[in-house]
Each structure stands twice: as structure tokens, then as C-alpha cells.
């Protein structure tokens, strides 16, 4: 799993919990440093976000399912973003742009695949589904 780099603990940054930079660094660690064949590595990404109650403190951060983010922030086109700041709160998650970037990286670099955690947190609508973005990348 390559996520949960930020959260509700006191020393946490108020930032993306599952960034592309963390994703590629972990992939490099497992393949290059640990010497595991890329085609045997399945890289994980979250179908949920972390909502911070303030843009300056991790206190009170909560996990939000991606499908809940889609509903709560419907007016903000959340599928096409990776973070939304509203009413003093900020939520970071993997929307279509970041999932596409990660999926392209996996395919272009010969990794074995992607694990989406937690699948039940994804949207069931093909237009907003994260799994659908991954699927379309792998069948190109």
C-alpha cells in the first residue's frame, strides 16, 4: 500500500496522503532497492480521502470514502480533482487525474498492477469511478 502518509496524528502535514511522489518512491524502493521484479509488484492506491478540519492543523482529520466525497462536493466536480478546499476544511484524495497518472506509471514501467483500497468506497457510476480509469488504462 502506498498511501496514508498524512492523517490525524500531531506531526502530520496537512497535505495529500497518497501523492504521486510517494507512489513512485515506494515503487522504486520495492523494485530497485529491494530487488523485486516489477511485474510481481502490485501498487496500491486509496479510494478514499483524508479531510482536514483546518488548512493548518491535522487535528480532527477524518477518512472519507471517495463516493462520499463525490456526493458532499458534487458542485465542485470532485472526480476531476485531487483536493477541494471549502469552508475552512480541505480534503485530499485520488481523483481521476491522479489515478490516471498512477495508472500510466504502472503500465509504462512494467509493474504488475494496481490494488484499489477500499473497492466499496469507489463510485458505481462509470463516469466517476476510479476503477474505470484504471481499467481503461490497462486495456489500451
Please annotate each region the language model reported:
Residues 43, 106, 114:
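Conserved, mostly hydrophobic/aromatic
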Residues 1-70:
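Substrate-binding surface in catalytic domains of secreted glycosidases
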Residues 14, 87-94, 115-120:
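Active-site rim elements
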Residues 95, 105, 120-140:
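Aromatic-rich peripheral "rim/lid" segments of glycoside hydrolase catalytic domains that contact
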Residues 25-28, 100-104, 108, 132, ...:
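Solvent-exposed, polar/charged alpha-helical surfaces in well-ordered, non-transmembrane soluble domains
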Residues 49, 56-111:
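Hydrophobic, secondary-structure "cap" segments at the distal end of domains
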Residues 18-25, 91-98, 126:
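Soluble or luminal CAZymes and related metallo-dependent hydrolases
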Amino acid at each position: 500500500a502506498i498511501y496514508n502518509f498524512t492523517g490525524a496524528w500531531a506531526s502530520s502535514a496537512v497535505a495529500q496522503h497518497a501523492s504521486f511522489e510517494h507512489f513512485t518512491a515506494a515503487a522504486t524502493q520495492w523494485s530497485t532497492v529491494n530487488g523485486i521484479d516489477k511485474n510481481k509488484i502490485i501498487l496500491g492506491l486509496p479510494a478514499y480521502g483524508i479531510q482536514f478540519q483546518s488548512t493548518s492543523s491535522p487535528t480532527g482529520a477524518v477518512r472519507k470514502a471517495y463516493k462520499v466525497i463525490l456526493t458532499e462536493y458534487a458542485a465542485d466536480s470532485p472526480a476531476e480533482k485531487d483536493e477541494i478546499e471549502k469552508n475552512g476544511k480541505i480534503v485530499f484524495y485520488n481523483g481521476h487525474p491522479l489515478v490516471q497518472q498512477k495508472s500510466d506509471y504502472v503500465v509504462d514501467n512494467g509493474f504488475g498492477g494496481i490494488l484499489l483500497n477500499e473497492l466499496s468506497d469507489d463510485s458505481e457510476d462509470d463516469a466517476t469511478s476510479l476503477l474505470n480509469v484504471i481499467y481503461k488504462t490497462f486495456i489500451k
